[in-house]
């Protein structure tokens, strides 16, 4: 990466990470997208931001298409490029945002992986297998109940602190993207699981820490008494899913998708679900308003005058 791009990229990453307060994982994704974009530009002999044209941006997206990138991946990369060019314009590194008129490629909307209510029940039941007095089992059960009850992102679960939970009021405070806080209800199942973990699990995990100053704030601790990591949550979800016999692709975000879908199917208003999820735009939430094939068939059979 040449000097013309290097300084601008560094400033951009500081802007989104510090000034806008985006999560570390989000900043890393932006960094990767922009680095690949600039590498491609430099293969075309473009080494300064103000040398980029609209055609270059369009050609890059076309190159991604030829490389077999999915529509979702291309749309995400273009969104990163849009942010980068807008920032460059604001910094007077360019005289125009040449990416502004470049539209995201159209593609089939892919619905997120969602568990049925029965599958969620099996997953949460499987988390309790292994003994109710084992602190790790108590933690896993509390963690998964918390994630399904709140629909939180994995970063919000790992970042949760003890003082973010009010078990008497059944409320949790989540720190979302851009350091935006929101309050979400905690159901009775989650409250019972968290209470059991706090009473008989967390203290023992905290004592396992070799640190001079124990982890006093974090809600969920790992086996060594430190704040639990994103990777650990992934491993817990995967292992618990295997014990539950769930064959669908399973990751922490699956619980968030399932939370939203089950609320919509239960009659919740999409605007309410938007607030619970912490989405900035209702458009993002509307993917959960999809109708299941079973519901479509049932509605058709009961509504169409010549269905039967």
Curated annotation (Swiss-Prot):
<dbReference type="GO" id="GO:0005737">
    <property type="term" value="C:cytoplasm"/>
</dbReference>
<comment type="function">
    <text>Site-specific tyrosine recombinase, which acts by catalyzing the cutting and rejoining of the recombining DNA molecules. The XerC-XerD complex is essential to convert dimers of the bacterial chromosome into monomers to permit their segregation at cell division. It also contributes to the segregational stability of plasmids.</text>
</comment>
<dbReference type="InterPro" id="IPR004107">
    <property type="entry name" value="Integrase_SAM-like_N"/>
</dbReference>
<feature type="domain" description="Core-binding (CB)">
    <location>
        <begin position="3"/>
        <end position="89"/>
    </location>
</feature>
<dbReference type="InterPro" id="IPR044068">
    <property type="entry name" value="CB"/>
</dbReference>
<feature type="domain" description="Tyr recombinase">
    <location>
        <begin position="110"/>
        <end position="301"/>
    </location>
</feature>
<feature type="active site" description="O-(3'-phospho-DNA)-tyrosine intermediate">
    <location>
        <position position="288"/>
    </location>
</feature>
<keyword id="KW-0159">Chromosome partition</keyword>
<protein>
    <recommendedName>
        <fullName>Tyrosine recombinase XerD</fullName>
    </recommendedName>
</protein>
<dbReference type="Pfam" id="PF00589">
    <property type="entry name" value="Phage_integrase"/>
</dbReference>
<keyword id="KW-0229">DNA integration</keyword>
<dbReference type="GO" id="GO:0009037">
    <property type="term" value="F:tyrosine-based site-specific recombinase activity"/>
</dbReference>
<dbReference type="Pfam" id="PF02899">
    <property type="entry name" value="Phage_int_SAM_1"/>
</dbReference>
<keyword id="KW-0963">Cytoplasm</keyword>
<feature type="active site">
    <location>
        <position position="253"/>
    </location>
</feature>
<dbReference type="InterPro" id="IPR011010">
    <property type="entry name" value="DNA_brk_join_enz"/>
</dbReference>
<dbReference type="GO" id="GO:0006313">
    <property type="term" value="P:DNA transposition"/>
</dbReference>
<feature type="active site">
    <location>
        <position position="256"/>
    </location>
</feature>
<dbReference type="InterPro" id="IPR023009">
    <property type="entry name" value="Tyrosine_recombinase_XerC/XerD"/>
</dbReference>
<keyword id="KW-0132">Cell division</keyword>
<keyword id="KW-0233">DNA recombination</keyword>
<comment type="subunit">
    <text>Forms a cyclic heterotetrameric complex composed of two molecules of XerC and two molecules of XerD.</text>
</comment>
<dbReference type="InterPro" id="IPR011932">
    <property type="entry name" value="Recomb_XerD"/>
</dbReference>
<dbReference type="GO" id="GO:0051301">
    <property type="term" value="P:cell division"/>
</dbReference>
<dbReference type="InterPro" id="IPR013762">
    <property type="entry name" value="Integrase-like_cat_sf"/>
</dbReference>
<dbReference type="InterPro" id="IPR002104">
    <property type="entry name" value="Integrase_catalytic"/>
</dbReference>
<dbReference type="GO" id="GO:0007059">
    <property type="term" value="P:chromosome segregation"/>
</dbReference>
<feature type="active site">
    <location>
        <position position="177"/>
    </location>
</feature>
<comment type="similarity">
    <text>Belongs to the 'phage' integrase family. XerD subfamily.</text>
</comment>
<dbReference type="InterPro" id="IPR050090">
    <property type="entry name" value="Tyrosine_recombinase_XerCD"/>
</dbReference>
<keyword id="KW-0131">Cell cycle</keyword>
<dbReference type="GO" id="GO:0003677">
    <property type="term" value="F:DNA binding"/>
</dbReference>
<dbReference type="InterPro" id="IPR010998">
    <property type="entry name" value="Integrase_recombinase_N"/>
</dbReference>
<feature type="active site">
    <location>
        <position position="153"/>
    </location>
</feature>
<keyword id="KW-0238">DNA-binding</keyword>
<feature type="active site">
    <location>
        <position position="279"/>
    </location>
</feature>
